[in-house]
Amino acid sequence: FAKNENKRSKPYSSPSAPGGLLTLKNVNDIIVTKKARIYRWSRKDIIPMQGRTHNCGQLRLANVGEEVKLVGWYENLRKVSKNLGFLILRDFYGTTQIVVETEEIMEQLSSINYESTIEIIGTVRERSSKNANLPTGEIEVVPSKLTVLGKCRYNELPFQINHSKEADENVRLKYRYLDLRNPQVKSKIVLRSKVVADLRASMIGHDFMEITTPILTCSSPEGARDYLVPARNHPGKFYALPQAPQQFKQLLMTSGIDRYFQIAPCFRDEDARADRSPGEFYQLDMEMAFADQEDVFEILEDVLPPIFAKYGIYHEASKPPFKRIPYLEAMDKYGSDKPDLRISLIVQDATEVLAECGFGPFAGNKVKAVVAENFKGTRKQIDKMCADVEVVSGQKAYWFRLDDKGELTGGISKFVVDHKDAVVSALGLKAGDFVALSAGDLKTAQKTAGVIRKTIGASFEGYMKKDCYEFCWVVDFPMYEIGEESGELEFCHNPCRRVVYRHLRL
């Protein structure tokens, strides 16, 4: 205030302050008064929100006899009479049954629509008929007062909240705020939050530092097309959204940061895939300085299994160390560079015994076989399996089987009969076995066989352990491959990797 003494002949004053002079205490009083005025509502139909005592998934038998205040959405009402009804109140945490026993509150409910926001003040009592399927199924609340905090204007909702997943996708997206009230939909967001929190805690526990890298950056080749953002002050120039924080984390390592991680957003302009959402996704991104492959493996073998065991469907994950499978072996035995090791089936090579059997698609091609022992599938199930394989891989699957007497039957068996002994010996077949086959160049035959393997494992009992997660590391990827669409040499994976020392001479 010293600089302003010449400009102001009088001190600050306030009509509400004693003597008109403004003191620190007066300032605080004025702030409190103004805050109080802010919370005064001028519209009578808007009611200020008061703190609830419990949420709708919280009350238990221990709360019987307590007066509580609940706030949530009006989900449903089962009307028994004009002065008796059973209301379901829902919030983020769950549902509570409200037993209305007064005509006044029943009339209030009849004047509002489902999904209106209401406040209930009432007393908790034990249910006479308990619901073991609900966390709050042992209690109910008898309301003494119901206050409508926000009316839903529509008599009919675009879909039933608890069945929103059955609605048209465009309708769900238009009314996403209603869709997210569905506990099944909401649970995915809750799960993601918990997984990310535990991942973050585990990485920090391993001395990693979380660092957020820039989103607007320059373009760098990562294997997909970039999303571009026009630079407003530089016409004709663009930022790129990062496909991965690769360059930034390498910069961090060079600058002396020893261990980095982030839950990184990645943007890739590519079509949707079975294992990847289009446009954007998030990944646990990490980098370690002065580390080798086994150092990285050791960290993740400690971080991942507990997360999957805690939040996964099966609650069991393979123990470290994980299997190490070379890329070529993975493609040869499993037809995939990310094999599902829960499936007991393996891919075998049948080129030598079947390429010249007289069946057109096999001629001059590689032939791969998947043998399912003691197979019990019906012809209808086999046809569906072949159709599913073609949808996923774009290639046909062929088959034959050995009946209980060891005779070839079904599918392309007539082309195999003359080579039966060689085929049985090469594939180790026995009576009751089923053989599914793929054909094409090496890569096509392998990938199609991989789809066959996964389809049989998932469709027929006895070939897949479905109650656990099986992890592995696929190592020794090739640096380049011929692109399926371009036909040109392309990176097989992210090129930002340490050199394999035995390849230095190349």
Where are the regions that the model predicts?
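Short, positively charged and aromatic/hydrophobic N-terminal segments
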Residues: 9-12, 23, 28-33, 37-40, ...
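Accessible peptide chain termini
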Residues: 1-3, 48-49
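Class II aminoacyl-tRNA synthetase catalytic cores and aaRS-like
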Residues: 28, 41-506
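Exposed boundary/loop context
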Residues: 1, 12-13, 34, 65, ...
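Short hydrophobic alpha-helical segments enriched in small aliphatic residues
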Residues: 2-7, 17, 27-29
